[in-house]
């Protein structure tokens, strides 16, 4: 019992020291970013969490991951534990490339990362970040996925608003509608584009398109029906779904019909099974859908 208490105290102290180190790092980063902003410059530095160089624009949304806290650590933990060298990662709604860069490092040059981001400001930073890290296995496209091939009007956010880029009306409570401009964007039907570009299998797909997720999934239905996508990491929000005329349950039922199990992404990237009667109580946040053939590999 004494031994257990001893190691418990050591672990507590170790965690406290780590938190203090993180706080010191974020404080130092805040000072560096303020200095860059005063000079009207962007900053190139290591982004905490993914530990890769990124262009840090003083006004971009993702500066919170540089100056305040590690952005979506649960998602990073899951990716770190499950994505392997040589595999394929598809990022729909890649923004400035936080996850695409992380996955490019993990899958190594033998793997493939495909990133789609329609927004002007976000895509420009995504392009810079790819060049900065010299990731030849990262393909970037200023376009989006949808239910069909078409050119649509897209709301592209200014610095600080880029995370709220959307095909729909800007309704997020943290977004300022006057900070967006409308630009024409090419949408591709996902299954068709992937077939044309010789993408036979996707080991992990991330989907975050501010409410348009259901339309993207409908355009990729064949890929899910044949379970050519092993895992899907998706942000589900009731409010954003309503803006596109559907309920999150529509996503859940569609993917279950295709043979996928539904999980909430918990602490340290652990998968927490969600049951049938949870459909009407979908919580905001990141969810994981895993093909039945992959279930036993992903619950640990």
Short names for language-model regions:
Residues 131-133, 155-161, 248-252, 280-282:
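Short, hinge-like loop/turn segments at secondary-structure boundaries
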Residues 103, 126, 154, 216-220:
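Hydrophobic packing residues within well-ordered alpha-helices of enzyme cores
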Residues 52-76, 136, 141-197, 285-289, ...:
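Glycine-rich adenosyl-binding loop in Rossmann-like folds that engage adenosine-containing cofactors
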Residues 120, 178-185, 236-246:
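Acceptor-substrate binding/catalytic loop of class I
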Residues 192-299:
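Conserved acidic-Pro-Pro-aromatic motif
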Residues 94-96, 120, 145-147, 209-213, ...:
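Short, glycine/acidic-enriched loop or turn micro-motifs at the edges of active sites
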Residues 1-129, 133, 179, 262-300:
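S-adenosyl-L-methionine
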């Amino acid at each position: 019992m004494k031994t257990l208490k001893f190691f418990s105290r050591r672990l507590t102290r170790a965690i406290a020291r780590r938190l203090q180190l993180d706080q010191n790092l974020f404080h130092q980063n805040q000072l560096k970013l303020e200095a860059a902003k005063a000079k009207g410059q962007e900053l190139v530095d290591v982004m905490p969490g993914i530990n890769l160089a990124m262009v840090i624009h003083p006004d971009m949304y993702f500066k919170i991951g540089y100056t305040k806290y590690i952005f979506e650590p649960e998602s990073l933990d899951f990716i770190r534990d499950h994505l392997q060298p040589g595999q394929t990662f598809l990022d729909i709604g890649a923004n400035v490339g936080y996850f695409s860069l992380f996955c490019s490092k993990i899958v190594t040059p033998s793997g493939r990362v495909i990133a789609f981001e329609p927004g002007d400001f976000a895509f420009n930073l995504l392009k810079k970040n790819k060049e900065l890290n010299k990731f030849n296995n990262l393909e970037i496209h200023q376009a989006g996925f949808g239910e069909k091939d078409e050119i649509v009007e897209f709301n592209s956010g200014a610095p600080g608003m880029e995370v709220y880029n959307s095909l729909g009306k800007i309704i997020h409570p943290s977004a300022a509608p006057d900070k967006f401009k409308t630009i024409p964007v090419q949408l591709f039907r996902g299954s068709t584009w992937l077939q044309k570009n010789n993408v036979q299998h996707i080991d992990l797909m991330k989907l975050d398109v501010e409410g348009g997720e259901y339309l993207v999934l409908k355009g990729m239905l064949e890929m899910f029906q044949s379970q050519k996508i092993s895992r899907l990491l998706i942000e589900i929000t009731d409010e954003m779904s309503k803006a596109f005329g559907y309920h999150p349950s529509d996503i859940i039922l569609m993917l279950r019909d295709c043979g996928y199990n539904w999980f909430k992404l918990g602490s340290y990237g652990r998968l927490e099974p969600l049951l049938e009667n949870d459909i009407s109580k979908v919580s905001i946040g990141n969810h994981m859908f895993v093909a039945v053939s992959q279930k036993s590999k992903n619950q640990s």
